[in-house]
Amino acid sequence: MAKAFLFHNPRCSKSRQALNLLEKEKENFEVFMYLDEKLEKDFLKEIIQKLGMSPRELLRTGESAYKENNLKDSNISEEEIINLMIEYPKLIERPIYVKGSKAIVGRPPENVLKII
């Protein structure tokens, strides 16, 4: 994986905006199509750690998989949440820009510029 990459969903307007901002800045990065490529558990844990967030904070609560898996339940462990994120990657908030030891959620998209 490149030193810098964007977790990207081309159907998401915020993700497309973040991609455009990074390209405009001539940032050297790779696009990671996280909905199409298999996420490895250790890799996802590393990204969550770089974000300085808990897995729960990174959940998209409006997704059907959130409701279907009762993720509102505060008794669900972080490990279980990570496993569900791997199984249902739409649960992961996006876009996420990772550069070296830093990562940031691109909400708003301009956030990605904070770590370039």
Residue ranges and their predicted role:
Residues 22, 115-116:
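Alpha-helix C-terminal capping segments
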Residues 26:
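Short glycine-rich hinge loops at helix-strand junctions in the catalytic core
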Residues 36-115:
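Thiol/selenol-based redox catalytic cores and closely related redox-interacting motifs
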Residues 1-21, 29-32:
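Local sequence-structure signature of Cys/Sec-based thiol-disulfide redox active-site neighborhoods
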